[in-house]
Amino acid sequence: MEGFRFLFQARNLCKLGLVFMLASSGAAFAQAKSKQSEVYMYEGADREQRLLEGARKEGMVSIYTSLNLKDSAPITEAFEKKYGIKVSLWRAGGEKVVQRALTEARAGRFTPDVFESDGIEIEILAREKMLAEFKSPVFKELPAEAFPPHRQYVVDRFNFFTIAYNTNLVKPDEVPNSYEDLLQPRWLGKVGIEAGDSDWFGSVVKAMGEKEGLAYFRKLADTRPQVRTGHTLISELVAAGEIPIAATVYNHAVERLTKNGAPIKWKALPPTFGRPGAVAVARNAPHPHAAVLFADFMLSREGQELIKQRNRVPSSKAVDSPLNKFPYRMIDPAIVLDESEKWENLWTDLFLKGKKQAKPSE
């Protein structure tokens, strides 16, 4: 999902009564908790054997994801081949994943076993009591940033915000080494930013110190950057030379273009932030053994290698990736959700409201 644009819609869903309706299903949740938790929290020596035997009896696993099919299908196909467990995969945008899950729960239908989506959507599901904690031996291979305090989901991939530049238009000695370098006169009207990146904005401001951070972004707004919708689009515009440099792209998207011969490179500027994607097991999963087995697979070296093969950034420390070899911090989905209105309003005032884009200088 681009830029968490449905945060206010998610709040509206709650106001319309979905939370109340979910709460009214407390008996179903309590029953599910005692049934599923035994599977989710088991750590005995025969754990893998018990999961596999239970999953084969269950016969399938149902997954709701926002990860696009060209990236998610190879993972589910590998899981089916390894374990012989049928996967039912439903893919949609992150907003629709949340809406469908909440709507089904309101009606007393609990279809998904596993959710895999951007961190903010998974955090919303956690707050709606849709998820449950689980244990896994692969956790030791993951960074501390992969676990929220409530531990009801686990980060399995990152989208790292970096700059990107066209190598035909930007000389090596012109490539910025800091965010301050983007304020140089040569970049007037030439810097691209994605329209929905208020979560990145808020994270960078807080890292700089709110007073200093807001002062910096006011200066950046004065350079009249070119605002576009879609990180993939911005990367493609940089590669095509329509925008010489962009401040908020995903480095894995740039890497794909580079491998295809496009004149584009990325660079991480400190502080570098990653927008997390996460995997979670459903509190009311109809196939709990298969749910944990798939979550294990997604977070294992095998699953993380498959994420890497799709030019995405795996969270595992056990999988080497050229896309995370720099100091980074994770954008906290809980903070984004709690503070979204503040940062969305500031972002809109600075970069979206009544702004005229400058024509790039020659």
Q: Positions of the model-derived regions?
A:
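A ligand-binding cleft/hinge motif common to bilobed small-molecule-binding domains
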Residues: E121-I124, P244-P263
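A bilobed periplasmic-binding-protein/Venus flytrap-type ligand-binding module shared by bacterial periplasmic
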Residues: T162-L169, V205-A207, R275-A290, L306
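Short amphipathic alpha-helical coupling segments at ligand-binding clamshell hinges
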Residues: I75, E212, Y216-K219, P286-M298, ...
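Extracytoplasmic ligand-binding site segments that recognize negatively charged/polar headgroups
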Residues: S62-T76, S88-I243
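Periplasmic-binding protein-like
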Residues: E141-A144, F158-F160, W187-G196, F217-A221, P225-R228, M298-V319, ...
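Short, polar/charged alpha-helical segment
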Residues: A45-R56, M60-S62, S66-K86, I163, ...
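Extracellular/periplasmic bilobal clamshell ligand-binding domains
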Residues: S321-E362
